[in-house]
């Protein structure tokens, strides 16, 4: 029989991998955003997005942009595809984080 620690370790590993995928996709989205949508790049502080002094309100602006799917009106299919990917990975990573936390408290 599989122990609870093994299940928790496997969940943590899957969660860590998906969070890494999300951060990588977010970095590439911000890189593409510089060319495809310069105004949004400036609004979300693209250059300082991943720095320690990054402005949280500007990061929340990108969250709301992706949440409300405003990117569907954009003309660049690469940009809209990347936005879809980042949105899906954010939902997946968030769900896995919640699930892993619940399982950790149950064990």
From Swiss-Prot:
Gene Ontology cellular component? plasma membrane
Q: What is its main location?
A: membrane
Its record classes its membrane topology as: Multi-pass membrane protein
Which sequence ranges are marked TM in the entry? 6-25, 89-106
InterPro entries, per database record: Universal_stress_protein_B (IPR019598)
Keyword annotations for this protein, in alphabetical order, are: Cell inner membrane, Cell membrane, Membrane, Transmembrane, Transmembrane helix
Question: Localized where?
Answer: Cell inner membrane
Please give the superkingdom of this protein's source. Bacteria
Q: Which family does it belong to?
A: Belongs to the universal stress protein B family.
The name this protein goes by in its record: Universal stress protein B homolog
Taxonomy of the source species: Bacteria, Pseudomonadati, Pseudomonadota, Gammaproteobacteria, Vibrionales
């Amino acid at each position: 029989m599989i122990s609870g620690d093994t299940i928790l370790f496997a969940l943590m590993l899957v969660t860590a991998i998906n969070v890494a995928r999300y951060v990588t996709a977010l970095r590439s989205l911000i890189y593409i955003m510089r060319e495809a949508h310069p105004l949004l790049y400036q609004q979300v502080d693209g250059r300082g997005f991943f720095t320690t002094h990054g402005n949280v309100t500007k990061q929340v602006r990108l969250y709301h942009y992706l949440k409300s799917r405003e990117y569907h009106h954009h003309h660049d299919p690469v940009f809209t595809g990347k936005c879809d990917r980042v949105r899906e990975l954010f939902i997946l990573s968030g769900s896995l984080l919640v699930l892993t936390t619940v399982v950790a408290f149950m064990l």
